[in-house]
Amino acid sequence: MNVQTRRLGLYALLLGAGILAPFLFPNYVSQIAILWIMILFALTWDVMGGQMGYNSLGNILFFGAGMYASAIVQIGLYYDVGDYTSAFGAVKVDFTFAQYLTGIVLGLIAAAVISALLAVVFGWIVFGLRGPYFAIGTLGVAIAAGEMVSAWEWVGAGGGISMPTYPGEPDDRSLIFYFLCLASAVATFVFLRWLYSTRFKLAINAIRDDEEKAEAMGIHTIRYKTVAWAVAAFFLGISGSIFGNMIGFIEPLEVAFPTVTFGIFMVVMSLLGGKGTIWGPILGATLFHVIKEVTWTYLLGWQWVALGLLIIVNVVYFQQGLLGWAQDRWPELFGIVVEDKDKADTADDDSIRRAAE
């Protein structure tokens, strides 16, 4: 059995487990659904933070933008959004199955496209910053977005907005959104897996390793940074649309733009598993989500202490993440050939040259 066959077998096993999970664990459907969203968070943050070395603290902006874009489209197709939100939930729009599904599909498309466009626009503003200045700049943009939406009366301001109600059985609704969460995470993984097999990965890794050298070799760094952020925003917008519909209500600061929770979680999960890899963010998201759910259930009141200790252990003892630590400790298990420094430097230069061709 060759490596490719084993890899396909692993993918099939994991996908099968994901499909069977809501039937094997019916009492934990929502928790497992959120796990897929967490995996998507970690994967998309790693596009910029791990592969390119630009640590964004504002990716939650695209999650919230997708959520609101989807809500506006889904409601606006059949009702005036301003009248709907000004009624403070007193007005309920009755949807047929056809109307509801049409709204979901168009809402997903709008969420993805608008979030990607926002990444392009804000990229022009913040990509002149580097290092901690970029991180702080993106954090400021995300916080400002949440505050602006909180003051926007047309979409409910701080009172939020209710999503359209599913016109069917609650159990069916749970399964629909579970599989939408699963599909979004799988689509993100598959697309990034393909993207990282192209010259695009060589280019963004070259930017991470030495941006000045990459520019000197002919790599259009602004273009690659913009595309990378737009790709991450595209999938984050989709996840925002799905999550908003799944919980049924959007509140700007705690649900759509939760900078101090989901916004930080996506960074921590990628670092925990090992940034700059495809499997590290998945491992980190899974471990983090399990620990979070266990502490929220059995250590209520101490859950933030437990998560804080997890972050401290990660930073002190596993600076390369769990996957990076395992690769350093047992490189032969991962097919890694240990090279001396001169050969490694030569390989880096060759990678930059290939990316610029």
Where are the regions that the model predicts?
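Transmembrane alpha-helices and adjacent helix-loop boundaries
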Residues: 1-357
